[in-house]
Amino acid sequence: MDVVFLGVKAHSLPQLAPQLKPVLGPDTTIVSTQNGIPWWYFQGFGGEWEGLRLERIDPGGVISAAIEARRVVGSIVYFSTEILSPGVIQHIEGNRISLGEPDGSRSDRCRRIAEVLIASGLRCPLTTRLRHEIWVKVLGNASFNPVSALTRATLVQMVRDPGVCSVIRNIMQEVEAVSCKLGMELPVSIEQRIAGAEKVGEHKTSMLQDLEAGRPMELEALVGAIVELGERAGLPMTHTRIVYNCTKLLAECAARQQAKNYLPGA
């Protein structure tokens, strides 16, 4: 197989990765599409962070053991969608998927993959600043997603509530501080990111959709990893940690209720 797109959420990768071996040829490329900090982020990063493995993302190193670093092409997906029913996805807005090599180089394989995606009707810019783009999306994911799960609110509802928007802004400031510690200066401001979310309107984040559907939430890749990185960098992460802890308990309670609902006579 020439190319494999990993379309599952980050928390499903540890189970999926060991099963990829039968479809991997000598030169198979694997495109990661997950939100949050990807498992490969510090492979080839250089400096004191080189080779760091985040246990919250790659427990026991099972993903990195199954997927060689040379195979990976990163991507950032800019689609807003909603799952209406199993196998039925409503597209709300956006048709862009950015592709890039983790080392920032320009490659023929990225160009070929982009050509196929563009031919299908998607926008597919190639980026040499993949990690910077990841942090722009993380800025929103780490703040809007958990707060939406806790409040059951849409993007526009959160942004237009002064108290809630203040919480979101505080989380974004902490995320920005982590990115700066890693040498990733964000190309957009916090206010621009908030304004962009408001334009999307009455959209439920993926984390809220998962909560309402009884599915596991993508909490560790979107929020837990940011807390872990901030702590490693000596940053307080006060607001992010509070929201993370509350959302983690929410996920645990939801999972227990889901299991109880499946018990006969419960």
Residue ranges and their predicted role:
Residues 38-40, 82, 134, 196, ...:
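Generic structural signal for helix capping and beta-alpha/helix-loop junctions
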Residues 12, 59, 106, 203, ...:
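Short phosphate-engaging motifs
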Residues 157, 165-266:
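NAD(P)-dependent Rossmann-like dehydrogenase/reductase catalytic/cofactor-binding core
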Residues 12-13, 39, 106, 215, ...:
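Alpha-helix N-cap/loop-to-helix initiation residues
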Residues 1-84:
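Rossmann-like NAD(P)(H) cofactor-binding subdomain of soluble oxidoreductases
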Residues 1, 23, 62-137, 143, ...:
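Internal alpha-helical scaffold of NAD(P)-dependent oxidoreductase catalytic cores
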